[in-house]
């Protein structure tokens, strides 16, 4: 595409799915595995996260909480509703995962332990630090590489610790 930037480099941060989508594509290219198989075998299975998946199988749909209503008034149940992820078959680097509170607690504990859960090392400490520290590519930006950090403008407002990080979104 041949388009001109709408802002000068370093001027502002605008959230976009494109970076995470490209990361998913890069993982597939470099690993030789589809993204869902890659994250399942290297992250979810070692952590025992048995109820986290892309495109939930029919037998697990009943465990998925409906989160949207389609234009006809039907609940969207176990179906990715992010348009970009949908166009990529429900498996993408930025959206499409379904999980449970238990599995999210496991993943969160691993992140709080800087990549370690039990005796299993999932990420290097330096990788977790890199992903959860403000990138400072733009002055006053709260963005980390893959996460967001507290700012007065965030949905958490003043209630989040300066050490917290997270990412809002939907499937």
Where do the model's predicted regions map?
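Short, small/polar residue-rich loop motifs at catalytic or cofactor-binding pockets
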Residues: 169-171
């Amino acid at each position: 595409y041949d388009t001109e930037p709408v802002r000068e480099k370093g001027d502002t941060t605008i959230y976009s799915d494109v970076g995470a989508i490209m990361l998913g594509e890069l993982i597939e290219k470099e690993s030789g595995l589809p993204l869902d198989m890659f994250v399942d075998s290297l992250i979810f299975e070692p952590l025992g996260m048995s109820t986290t998946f892309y495109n939930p199988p029919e037998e697990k749909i009943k465990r998925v909480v409906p989160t949207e209503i389609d234009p006809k008034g039907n609940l969207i149940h176990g179906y990715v509703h992010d348009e970009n992820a949908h166009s990529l078959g429900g498996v993408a680097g930025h959206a499409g995962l379904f999980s449970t509170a238990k599995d999210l607690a496991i993943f969160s504990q691993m992140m709080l332990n800087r990549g370690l859960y039990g005796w299993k090392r999932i990420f290097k400490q330096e990788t977790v630090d890199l992903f959860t520290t403000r990138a400072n590519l733009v002055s006053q930006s709260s963005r980390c590489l893959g996460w967001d950090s507290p700012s007065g403008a965030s949905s958490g407002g003043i209630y989040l610790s300066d050490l917290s990080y997270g990412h809002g979104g939907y499937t």
